[in-house]
């Protein structure tokens, strides 16, 4: 099953509101947000032995990369919005 089939309803809803590219970016951003929450939750239960209260380095790196990807996607959405607004 493709990503388009798995997320058909969300894609349809967002593409209707934001256009095809904006809708797809919005759904990608939602998926990254969900992944960020899941990895963050995992980090709560898997603590760093050397730094109590902090997630292990691999989880911290994944969290940082997902947050960076979200920021880039958000910037593309904002650029697209500013180009469409006169």
Residue ranges, per PLM feature:
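Long, low-complexity or tandemly repetitive, helically biased scaffold regions used
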Residues: 2-86
